[in-house]
Amino acid sequence: IWKKIADYYKNEPVILGYDLINEPIAPYFENMDELNAKLEPLHKRVTAAIREVDPNHIIMLGAPQWNGNFKPFKDWNYDDKLMWTCHRYGGDPIRPAIMNFIEFRDSTDMPMYMGEIGHNTDEWQETFCKTMEEANIGYTFWPYKKIRNSCFSGIVPPENWEKIIEF
């Protein structure tokens, strides 16, 4: 499927790149370690398929466990247009809280892109965006579909909402 997608978008200048798998392998999967070991070979196969039709666009590699665990990756020299992508919701909005991403990025000499941040307080967002900019990490503000929070779109829960979600 990725080869077909890449063939369709190969000449589109508005496409930043291809984010192969969003948040692969949840941390609660019983066979998480087994699946983690299969992710890098999958990335390589998909990258090769994309490169058959599109040599130009960036390919974003998401890590397992909500795009946060980069330990399974051992080889990143198979393409010259790869970029890591990570996600961050909550926690401290300061540099020490994302040092694992910064250190991994620096050890691989590849860019890191924070593909999702959001649904925190305005103060948290302001601090975290400054942290990302100082760390030279691009980011996407992703606060969609939230309840009772600052975001692009959200809802005020209807009366008895708690009863619905408790059901």
Per-region residue spans from a language model:
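Extracellular glycoside hydrolase catalytic/binding regions
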Residues: K3-K146, C151-E166
